[in-house]
């Protein structure tokens, strides 16, 4: 059974979605992560280190911490279906809408991971950046 694209879970007319409305049709595509990757390429969305941002399957990160993986590769693990798809779609929309903010937050997270390592909980710095 194929998962429903995240657009089906959204009320596109909700006022809080107004800034994102131009991007919502991309979430209706069967391979919406690829559609958002193409849009990221078109907009030249980059990490703080200048790497192009792309939305990839979660297994792409392997055992690497999520934010560290993004900072090192520009590849954002994105669940295309299931319970996490809507959350990851929202994250991708933020990368497309607020790319410099997302890049700065990701860089801060990655720096904290490099400093403190991965622990059972995020810690104050990473919680604030999340």
Regions found by a protein language model. Name each.
Residues 1-75:
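The feature captures two recurrent sequence modes
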Residues 65-130:
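Aromatic- and glycine-enriched beta-alpha-beta binding-site module
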């Amino acid at each position: 059974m194929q998962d429903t694209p995240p657009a089906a879970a959204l009320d596109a007319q909700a006022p809080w979605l107004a800034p994102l409305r131009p991007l919502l049709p991309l979430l209706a595509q069967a391979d919406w992560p690829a559609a958002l990757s193409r849009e990221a390429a078109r907009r030249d969305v980059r990490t703080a280190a200048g790497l192009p941002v792309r939305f990839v399957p979660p297994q792409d990160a392997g055992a690497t911490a999520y934010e560290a993986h993004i900072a090192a590769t520009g590849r954002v693990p994105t669940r295309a279906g299931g319970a996490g798809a809507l959350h990851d779609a929202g994250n991708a929309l933020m990368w497309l809408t607020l790319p410099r903010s997302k890049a700065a937050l990701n860089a801060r997270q990655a720096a904290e991971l490099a400093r403190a390592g991965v622990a059972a909980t995020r810690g104050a710095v990473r919680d604030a950046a999340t």
